[in-house]
From Swiss-Prot:
Molecular function terms, GO-annotated: asparaginyl-tRNA synthase (glutamine-hydrolyzing) activity; ATP binding; glutaminyl-tRNA synthase (glutamine-hydrolyzing) activity
Pfam families, per database record: GatB_N (PF02934), GatB_Yqey (PF02637)
Gene: gatB
Catalytic reaction list: L-glutamyl-tRNA(Gln) + L-glutamine + ATP + H2O = L-glutaminyl-tRNA(Gln) + L-glutamate + ADP + phosphate + H(+); L-aspartyl-tRNA(Asn) + L-glutamine + ATP + H2O = L-asparaginyl-tRNA(Asn) + L-glutamate + ADP + phosphate + 2 H(+)
Description of how the protein assembles with itself and partners: Heterotrimer of A, B and C subunits.
Name of protein: Aspartyl/glutamyl-tRNA(Asn/Gln) amidotransferase subunit B
Length: 494
C-alpha cells in the first residue's frame, strides 16, 4: 500500500539491513453505559464484582441480549475508518479456558465481522504520511481481571470488566517502524475520541494493543511473527517493537529460527519475554453462537448514523487550512485532540469566525495557551483562560489597542487572576500608545542621546533594531511597533 521503505527506516544488523513488518490489533472499549450482552454497568473503578449480572457470571440458563448502542458505536467507528459496513454479521464462540472467563468461551466475531476493510491516513513526525489498511473491526466481550495482590496464597477474580464491549480493530501489516506504529495508534485514538465511541484512556485499559512483529530482508518474504499482548501505552508500543525487532534479528543472524509465539512486554526492563506458543484460529474451535441470531440491519440504519457523525480530524484540518490559512503543522496540532479543536473553534466563534483572525488566534492558542498548559501539566479542560477571554486578547491585538508584548502581560494577568481582558487594559493603563507626537518625542530623545549608534545604523540598517528596542523599553512596551519602525526609518534616513 505504501512506497518501499527508505534506507533510513531499515534496521542495520551484522549481516546487512533488515525491514520490520508490523500489524496491530487494537482493543478499544466501547463507550456505552451497559455491557455488550447484559445491562450491568461499565463504570470504571467500582468495588470488585460490583457490576456483574447473572449473564456476566455465566449463571445457568442466562441468555445474552445484544446492546444496540454497542452495535451503533461499532458502525460509527467503521464509518470513521472509511470502512465497509457489513449489514449482516455473526457472533461466534471462541473457546478457551481462563479463570476470568466464566463462560468457558468468549463471544466474538470470526468469519463475519460487523465492519470490513478500511483505511487510516497517518501523518508522521517527519512530515511524511502513510496509509494503514484496516483488515476488520469486530465486536467481542472483554474478560474479567485476576487480582494477585489481595492474598498471600490465593488469586481472586473481579468480573466487573467481564462482558464489557470491545471493538477489536485489526490493521493490515502496513507499518514499517516503531514511529509509524505510534503515530497510527495516536491517530486511531484521535478518531475514536472524535466519534465518541471510545474514550481512549490507556491508563484505565480502555485502549490497548496486541503488536505483531516480524522481520525480513528488504523486499523478501514475510518472516515468522510474534505477538506482544496487551501493550497499554503508545510509548511502550514503540519500545516493545524496537526490542522485539532487535531480538528477532539477533536470532536470525546467529543462524536460528523465530518461533511463532505470544510474548509480554516488561515495561520495567524494556524487553519482551515469552508467554506461550501462539495459537491458531483452529485452536479456539470457533462456531456460531447458538444463543444469538445473526446481527442484521439495513443500509438506512447505517445512513442515519452516518448523517450524524461529527466532523473528523482530517476534514477539520483541511477546513482550518482552507478557511483560515493555517499551516499543515498548526492545523495538525489543533485537531490532534477534539477538545483542542473545539477550543480553537470557540475562540473563532467569539471573534465572529472571520478568516483574518484565524492565524493570530491559532498562534495564541498553540504557543501561549498550549505552551502554558503543557508547562503546568494541565489539560485544556482545566485552562484558567477561557475561549472568550483569549478571543478578547486576540481582538485587542487585532484592533491595535495593545501590542503583542503587552498582550503577553495581559495573558499572564488573566491566567493568574482572571477578569475581563478589555476591562483590565482600561483599569491598568495597558493601552498601546498610538499618538504619533508622543512616540516621535521618545524617538527624538533616543536618537539625540546616541549619535554613535545613529552612524552605525546608517551604515548597517539591521542595527535599527537596537533603536526599536530602546523606544519600546522607554514607552513600557506601549508604543505602536509599526509607528516606531516608520518614524525611525524616516529619521535615520533608511
Amino acid at each position: 500500500m505504501n512506497a518501499p521503505v527508505k534506507p533510513s527506516k531499515l534496521i542495520k544488523g551484522a549481516t546487512g539491513d533488515w525491514e520490520v513488518v508490523i500489524g496491530l490489533e487494537v482493543h478499544a472499549q466501547v463507550a456505552s453505559n451497559a455491557k455488550l450482552f447484559s445491562g450491568a454497568s461499565t463504570e470504571f473503578g467500582g468495588a470488585p464484582n460490583a457490576h456483574v449480572s447473572l449473564v456476566d457470571a455465566a449463571m445457568p440458563g442466562m441468555l445474552p441480549v445484544i446492546n444496540e448502542e454497542c452495535v451503533a458505536q461499532a458502525v460509527r467507528t467503521g464509518l470513521g475508518l472509511n470502512a465497509q459496513i457489513n449489514l449482516r454479521s455473526v457472533f461466534d464462540r471462541k473457546n478457551y479456558f481462563y479463570p476470568d472467563l466464566p463462560q468457558g468461551y468468549q463471544i466474538s466475531q470470526y468469519k463475519s465481522p460487523v465492519v470490513g476493510e478500511g483505511v487510516v491516513e497517518v501523518d508522521l513526525p517527519d512530515g511524511e504520511g502513510i496509509s494503514v489498511g484496516i483488515e476488520r473491526l469486530h465486536l467481542e466481550q472483554d474478560a474479567g481481571k485476576l487480582l494477585h495482590d489481595q492474598h498471600p496464597t490465593s488469586t481472586f477474580v473481579d468480573l466487573n470488566r467481564s462482558g464489557v464491549a470491545l471493538m477489536e480493530i485489526v490493521s493490515k501489516p502496513d507499518i514499517r517502524s516503531s514511529e509509524q506504529a505510534k503515530a497510527y495508534v495516536s491517530k486511531l485514538r484521535t478518531i475514536l475520541r472524535y466519534l465518541g465511541t471510545c474514550d481512549g484512556d490507556m491508563e484505565k485499559g480502555s485502549l490497548r494493543a496486541d503488536v505483531n512483529v516480524s522481520v525480513r530482508k528488504p523486499g523478501g518474504p514475510l518472516g515468522t511473527r510474534c505477538e506482544i499482548k496487551n501493550v497499554n501505552s503508545i510509548r511502550f508500543i514503540g519500545q516493545a517493537i524496537e526490542y522485539e525487532a532487535r531480538r528477532q534479528i539477533g536470532i536470525l543472524e546467529d543462524g536460528g529460527a523465530i518461533v511463532q509465539e505470544t510474548r509480554l512486554f516488561d515495561a520495567g526492563k524494556g524487553e519482551t519475554r515469552s508467554m506461550r506458543s501462539k495459537e491458531e484460529a483452529h485452536d479456539y474451535r470457533y462456531f456460531p453462537d447458538p444463543d444469538l441470531l445473526p446481527l442484521e440491519f439495513s443500509q438506512d440504519y447505517v445512513d442515519a448514523l452516518k448523517a450524524k457523525l461529527p466532523e473528523l480530524p482530517d476534514a477539520k484540518k483541511a477546513r482550518f487550512m482552507a478557511e483560515f490559512g493555517l499551516s499543515l503543522e498548526d492545523a495538525g496540532v489543533l485537531v490532534a485532540e477534539r477538545e483542542s479543536a473545539e477550543f480553537y473553534e470557540a475562540v473563532l466563534a467569539a471573534l465572529g469566525n472571520q478568516p483574518r483572525d484565524g492565524k493570530l488566534a491559532a498562534n495564541w492558542v498553540i504557543n501561549e495557551l498550549f505552551g502554558r498548559l503543557n508547562k503546568e501539566g494541565r489539560d485544556i479542560a482545566a485552562s484558567p483562560v477561557s475561549a472568550a477571554q483569549l478571543a478578547t486578547i486576540v481582538e485587542l491585538i487585532g484592533e491595535g489597542t495593545i501590542s503583542g508584548k503587552i498582550a503577553k502581560d495581559l495573558f499572564e494577568i488573566v491566567w493568574c487572576e482572571g477578569g475581563d481582558p478589555r476591562e483590565l487594559v482600561e483599569t491598568r493603563g495597558m493601552k498601546q500608545v498610538t499618538d504619533l507626537g508622543a512616540i516621535e518625542k521618545v524617538v527624538d530623545d533616543i536618537i539625540q542621546a546616541n549619535p554613535d549608534k545613529v552612524a552605525q545604523a546608517q551604515a548597517k540598517p539591521a542595527l535599527m533594531g537596537w533603536f526599536v528596542g530602546q523606544v519600546m523599553k522607554s514607552s513600557g512596551g506601549k508604543a505602536n511597533p509599526q509607528s516606531v519602525n516608520d518614524l525611525l526609518k524616516s529619521k535615520l534616513g533608511l
